[in-house]
């Protein structure tokens, strides 16, 4: 039996981990790649905490700023101590804080593997290693048998023991071993205080990045919220949306459930509020009605504030829309209701964003066709007391004015070229906003895999990282080829999703397609592997690359690229 492999969160050195396809289970902890083990171990424990504190008083960017290997400037000069145990771990140059983090990782790997003995004078590290040996390692080893046993019990109609849900790479080793009937979070406690702190930090970094890119304060963002990710994180997306509009949840101190919200005054916020339009998934709609009502009430309350338009564009916009709707004949209550809609999703009972069939079946001519599908599928308004009212015009009005599309990724167990959901929601919103507003909005794909250090990246940057770090990485290709038919399918699916991002956003550059072409078509080893193990996957990949050329999404450097691909279509290369 196999289980889907994982892409762990980025380790502190900033490397993008790769996965080798489906992993055979069970595996000892030592047999896992260090990147996977490191991500399981980093939160919430550090193998060097205590003996070499994770927050040294030396080595930071300034005398007053401590060095934290989980949240530091990797390119900054290292000004701290150079212990002999770290000097001997690598012959590589030691100049930056990133070099220091890399040495700490290498030492941690050797300690976990038992290749380096843990000094007696490091009691805290010895405690952590004992915890790994007594709890984490057995939990990982138990996963395979537990999943097989639970599957057979479920098929036989017998009891499957319950267990918590979450991402083990985000500080939740208690979800191991897998194979249990997992239960979710208490939705009344979402967003959690921890999620709000992450959401607040991410919101501030997002605003800072926008100001750096555009030289002005942002006014309106479009944000996607998925149910599964918010279950794993305790509500990162909801928390970020609340932080952007300048609102903080209020929790009951006993139950830790959310009981309301607090509007942060401009003097404390120290920046303008940002108008946020939420595009929720169908599962989010079903699982988090309290959070829908919370955000709806909060943004309407912010819209009623008597604040300057420069501080509160939400209120300025709502006042203007109410006046316009009243002039068109609506009563004040109806006008206020429509002007306050900020949460949209698919109609009740429906799921997805509506783009997958168009992409798969080539049922579109222009990007406007994809935008239309996104608008038709997601133009139903939700809120407190509102459960999917058709409001196409209001949805269009919201998307017409958004300046940035925001998508958060809560873990590194997958990437944006692993799933069709990212291009459908993120790409669909971008296509619709471009079609309605006449200009392509900025697109930010944020990394929340390490709660202590959220990272804001543009979609172009994220696609570049994934293409270089995973898609055309020889280590990933060698690993995926070990799995025959399914490995070839994964390669073709990755090319599909890359093409879909090019179609919806234009964020895929020629060199991205060129790298894929060189890795999967020009490389005879990979081409022959796909032809032998999964000819259908090779055909699908070839057709997708030819479609990219035909639609002018990719202009190959080589004049022979089309000929090579068409030769495959005639079976010449497949038979060679």
Question: What do the PLM-derived regions correspond to, one by one?
Answer:
Residues 23-33, 54-62:
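Short, tandemly repeated low-complexity microdomains enriched for cysteine and small residues
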Residues 3-10:
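Short, exposed "boundary/linker" segments that immediately precede the start
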Residues 1-2, 63-576:
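Ligand/cofactor-recognition surfaces for anionic moieties
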Residues 35-46:
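Extended, structured, electrostatic nucleic-acid-contact surfaces
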Residues 20-21, 50-51:
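Glycine-biased, low-complexity coil/linker segments
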């Amino acid at each position: 039996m196999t289980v889907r492999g994982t892409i762990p969160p980025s380790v502190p050195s900033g490397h993008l981990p790769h996965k080798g396809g489906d992993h055979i289970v069970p595996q000892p902890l030592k047999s896992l790649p260090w990147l996977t083990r490191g991500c399981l171990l980093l939160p919430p424990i550090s193998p060097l905490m205590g003996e070499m504190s994770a927050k040294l008083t030396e080595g930071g960017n300034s005398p007053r700023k401590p060095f934290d290997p989980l949240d530091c400037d990797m390119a900054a000069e290292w000004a701290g101590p150079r212990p002999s145990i770290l000097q001997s771990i690598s012959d590589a140059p030691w100049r930056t804080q990133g070099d220091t983090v890399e040495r700490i990782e290498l030492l941690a790997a050797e300690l976990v593997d038992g290749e380096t003995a843990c000094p007696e004078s490091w009691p805290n590290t010895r405690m952590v290693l004992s915890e790994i040996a007594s709890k984490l390692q057995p939990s990982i080893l138990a996963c395979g048998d537990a999943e097989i046993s639970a599957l057979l019990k479920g098929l036989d109609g017998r009891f499957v023991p319950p267990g918590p849900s979450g991402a083990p790479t985000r500080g939740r080793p208690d979800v191991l071993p897998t194979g249990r009937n997992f239960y979710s979070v208490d939705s009344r406690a979402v967003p959690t205080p921890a999620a709000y702190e992450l959401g607040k930090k991410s919101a501030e970094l997002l605003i800072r990045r926008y100001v750096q890119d555009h030289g002005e304060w942002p006014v309106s963002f479009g944000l996607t919220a998925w149910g599964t990710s918010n279950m794993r994180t305790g509500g990162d997306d909801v928390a970020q949306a609340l932080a952007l509009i300048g609102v903080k949840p209020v929790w009951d101190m006993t139950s830790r459930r959310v009981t309301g919200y607090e509007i942060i005054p401009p003097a404390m916020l120290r920046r303008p509020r940002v108008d946020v339009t939420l595009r929720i998934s169908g599962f989010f709609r079903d699982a988090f009605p309290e959070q829908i009502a919370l955000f709806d009430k909060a943004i309407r309350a912010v819209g009623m504030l008597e604040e300057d338009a420069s501080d509160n564009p939400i209120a300025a916009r709502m006042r203007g829309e109410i006046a316009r709707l009243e002039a068109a004949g609506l009563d004040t209550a109806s006008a206020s209701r429509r002007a306050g809609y900020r949460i949209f999703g698919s109609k009740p009972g429906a799921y997805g964003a509506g783009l997958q069939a168009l992409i798969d079946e080539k049922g579109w001519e222009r990007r406007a066709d994809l935008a239309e599908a996104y608008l038709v599928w997601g133009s139903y308004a939700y809120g407190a007391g509102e459960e999917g009212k058709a409001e196409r015009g209001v949805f269009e009005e919201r998307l017409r004015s958004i300046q940035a599309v925001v998508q958060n990724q809560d873990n590194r167990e997958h990437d944006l070229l692993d799933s069709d959901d990212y291009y459908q929601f993120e790409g669909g919103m971008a296509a619709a906003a471009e079609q309605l507003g006449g200009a392509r909005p900025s697109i930010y794909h944020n990394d929340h895999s390490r709660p202590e250090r959220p990272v804001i990246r543009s979609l172009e940057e994220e696609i570049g990282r994934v293409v270089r770090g995973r898609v055309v990485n020889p280590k990933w290709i060698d690993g995926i080829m070990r799995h025959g038919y399914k490995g070839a399918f994964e390669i073709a699916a990755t090319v599909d999703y890359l093409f879909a991002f090019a179609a919806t956003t234009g964020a895929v550059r020629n060199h991205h397609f060129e790298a894929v072409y060189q890795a999967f078509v020009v490389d005879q080893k990979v081409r022959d592997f796909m032809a032998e193990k999964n000819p259908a996957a090779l055909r699908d990949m070839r057709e997708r690359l030819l479609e990219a050329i035909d639609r002018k999404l990719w202009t190959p450097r080589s004049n022979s690229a089309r000929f090579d691909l068409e030769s495959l279509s005639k079976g010449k290369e497949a038979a060679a």
